[in-house]
A protein has these predicted regions:
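Twin-arginine (Tat) signal peptide motif
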Residues: 6-7
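GH16 jelly-roll
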Residues: 146-397
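Low-complexity, Ser/Thr/Pro-rich intrinsically disordered linker/stalk segments at domain junctions
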Residues: 2, 11, 16, 20, ...
Length: 397
């Protein structure tokens, strides 16, 4: 087991009261960064230490996320030797030396995660010296890494124009079909103003609602008087189908989700023929709803049925409060040949290697009212909107 002296040493580092002989500087007092994960902290940088003073773990990796989580960068170090609780120092290159910017601990998989407010930097992580089972484990450093070296931005839309521009366009305009016989995407529900894309939901007028109900009655055999009992709605959906496709990479968007229930906002991806895995990197059903927010994958089953692989988002600070829904949040999904990693505001919310797609997908942003959920919709709270500040894609160079 990890001996207690290393724990005390780590606590002393956090307090800024000991000299660390392995990185050659006195650790500065640290304070948690807003929104950072437990166990990760950052504060006033320590003094620099010369390059190359710590032996490298040649099998270790250091991943620097390209996503700007509202001023924070996520860095994940993975060491070849897993020692749960082992203190790890994240350092950025500063001139000819290294400057400590955060402290964390290894988990049982040998990983240590950091949130730091220093975005454009070259980093390394140092697993500090500890004693385990009566043996000293020497300090080891990961290879250095930076987001600029690991990622290249290949797509960006900040919705700065007055109208929707390529490659996004309205999808399925005016089309009513299951599971939305009583709602359809409409161009009028897509608006841009001051760099914000707003996707809306609104109840339609009596005249058009009557036409929709008559159409539903013809399709389903239901009496028109009983069709769409919860109302008829205009929805919004845009996508890059036929214009932009991506296979693997990191997709992120800064968004504000509607708090109203009876509808769902989604940032998702689909193949052009719709036969492969649908990737819902964020789907939101409103404040207080049973589904809440989800990271979800929808592969096809043996009989072409739609399956669900994913999880509800529960571990993001503040998500259970009403105020959270009035703010913008950055949602990301990293998709690689090894699997998917989902994050909200930099917090990992779901990770899986299941339902892994290898095919190109296009991007979709939508706010929809499906027939199965409109019984929870309160028309007095309409119109509602799903607001998007930007959406970006990065890939490995």
């Amino acid at each position: 087991m990890l001996e207690s002296r290393s724990r005390k040493f780590f606590a002393a580092l956090l307090a800024g009261v000991v000299l660390n002989p392995l990185i050659g500087c006195t650790a500065a007092p640290t304070t948690p960064v807003g929104g950072s994960l437990p166990g990760s902290s950052a504060g006033t940088p320590s003094a620099t230490t010369p390059l190359g003073d710590v032996p490298k773990d040649s099998s270790a990796t250091l991943e620097v996320s390209p996503v700007p989580f509202d001023g924070q960068t996520v860095v994940v170090a993975t060491f070849s030797s897993a020692v749960a609780g082992r203190p790890v120092s994240l350092q950025k290159r500063s001139g000819d030396g290294w400057q400590e910017v955060a402290l964390s601990e290894q988990d049982k998989k040998g990983q240590a995660e950091f949130h730091t407010d220093t975005a454009k930097a070259s980093y390394r992580a140092v697993a500090l010296e500890v004693a385990k089972d009566g043996k000293d484990l020497n300090a080891l450093a990961t290879p250095s890494a930076s987001a600029a070296a690991q990622w290249k931005q290949v797509f960006s839309d900040d919705f700065s124009g007055s109208t929707l521009g390529r490659p996004f366009r309205v999808r399925s305009a005016g089309q009513y079909y299951a599971p939305r016989y009583c709602a359809a995407s409409q161009p009028s529900m897509v608006k841009l103003d001051n760099g914000i894309l707003s996707l809306g939901v609104a109840e339609v007028g009596a005249g058009r609602a009557k036409q929709v109900r008559e159409n539903v009655a013809r399709i389903t055999g239901t009496a028109a008087s009983k069709a769409c009992p919860d109302g008829v709605y205009d929805n919004a959906m845009i996508g890059t189908q036929g214009k932009y496709l991506v296979t693997y990479g990191t997709v992120a968007a800064r968004m504000k989700f509607p708090a109203q229930r009876g509808m769902h906002a989604a940032a998702w991806m689909q193949t052009s023929d719709g036969t492969d895995v649908e990737i819902d990197f964020m789907e939101s059903f409103g404040f207080g709803s049973r589904q809440g927010m989800q990271n979800m994958l929808h592969p096809k089953g043996p009989n072409n049925e739609r399956l669900d692989v994913g999880a509800n988002v529960k571990n993001v600070p503040g998500i259970a409060t009403r105020e959270w829904w009035d703010q913008y949040h950055v949602v990301s999904m990293e998709w690689s040949p090894d699997g998917y990693v989902f994050r909200v505001d930099g917090v990992e919310t779901y990770r899986t290697s299941k339902a892994l797609s290898k095919r190109p997908h296009f991007l979709v942003l939508s706010l929809q009212t499906s027939d199965y959920e409109t019984n929870r919709l309160d028309p007095s709270q309409l119109p509602a909107s799903f607001d998007v500040d930007w959406i970006r894609v990065w890939q490995r160079p």
